[in-house]
């Protein structure tokens, strides 16, 4: 899949844009002032496969905690700043790898210059985060409504503020809870600038609804070569955001590592408790780091036949099942032992 070429920026040890891989981001939902809990959550996100993590910085206590946080985690930390430019300066001083701000809401040009200068000295990029819920009044008055054109104009205005103070290590996000508006906005902005784009559907919802909306929005753009880093916004454990984000990237071939898991939807031919088996296999595969494709199929029609491309899998029978590798049957196993035998074979691969 051909990606649209963008400028490359460095976020801590991670590159975003250019020829670098598409990365997965998340945001902590702990109180940043509680450095212990925030560090614990970031470490869980790292284990899940997160590449970059963002922390809210609502006040100076939170900004001060960033010093302890950044010293004790491996992931690059992005400080999420609104309104007070001094929080951005404090965050930079305390070791963050990037800022997320809207230059237009942190004050005068002089204040923007101070933030940009400080970020430039530390080689820290700035993400301009435009959101459909926080458009400027003059833009809303111009368009009379929130729309893709309005969001893009807001983003370009913020870009110009930074460019005017000679700052170009920029990442852009234009998020909306309306999936079609989000898609249209990124399509438009990708034609206007070559800065890396951070994809996401804001306020996407709970794990179920949010996964659907994010997969459609982010997936559509990735299929068109648009996007350099992604964040799946979910109401829930941030680790789930990372899991969903990584699966989206796997689907489009942007992430080759880790297990790809497939299973059939079951039908009248299914004679084993495939739903229970599939859920158990999927859960146990979370601890597997091997880059393999695993299939759990309800009958011999779907597996090993239709699942021939899988590295290993199960095909159900009546009270028993077949374990196959690359379409070749290797053993017949009783239903109650299927999962254990499958995992044993995977461990030996």
Curated annotation (Swiss-Prot):
Give the E.C. number(s). 1.17.7.3
A GO BP term here is: terpenoid biosynthetic process
Q: What InterPro entries would the database entry show?
A: Dihydropteroate_synth-like_sf (IPR011005), IspG_bac (IPR016425), IspG_bac-typ (IPR004588), NO2/SO3_Rdtase_4Fe4S_sf (IPR045854)
Which Pfam family is one of this chain's hits?
GcpE
Q: Which cofactor does it need?
A: [4Fe-4S] cluster
Give the cofactor note text: Binds 1 [4Fe-4S] cluster.
The reactions it catalyses are: (2E)-4-hydroxy-3-methylbut-2-enyl diphosphate + oxidized [flavodoxin] + H2O + 2 H(+) = 2-C-methyl-D-erythritol 2,4-cyclic diphosphate + reduced [flavodoxin]
User: What residues does [4Fe-4S] cluster bind to?
Assistant: 264, 267, 299, 306
Give the pathway: Isoprenoid biosynthesis; isopentenyl diphosphate biosynthesis via DXP pathway; isopentenyl diphosphate from 1-deoxy-D-xylulose 5-phosphate: step 5/6
Which GO molecular function annotations are given, in alphabetical order? 4 iron, 4 sulfur cluster binding; 4-hydroxy-3-methylbut-2-en-1-yl diphosphate synthase activity (ferredoxin); 4-hydroxy-3-methylbut-2-enyl-diphosphate synthase activity (flavodoxin); iron ion binding
Instruction: Enumerate the UniProt keywords alphabetically.
Output: 4Fe-4S, Iron, Iron-sulfur, Isoprene biosynthesis, Metal-binding, Oxidoreductase
The protein's matches in Gene3D superfamilies, at most eight in alphabetical order, are given as: Dihydropteroate synthase-like, Sulfite Reductase Hemoprotein, domain 1
Homology family = Belongs to the IspG family.
Q: What does this protein do?
A: Converts 2C-methyl-D-erythritol 2,4-cyclodiphosphate (ME-2,4cPP) into 1-hydroxy-2-methyl-2-(E)-butenyl 4-diphosphate.
Please report the name of this protein according to its UniProt entry: 4-hydroxy-3-methylbut-2-en-1-yl diphosphate synthase (flavodoxin)
Q: Supply the gene name.
A: ispG
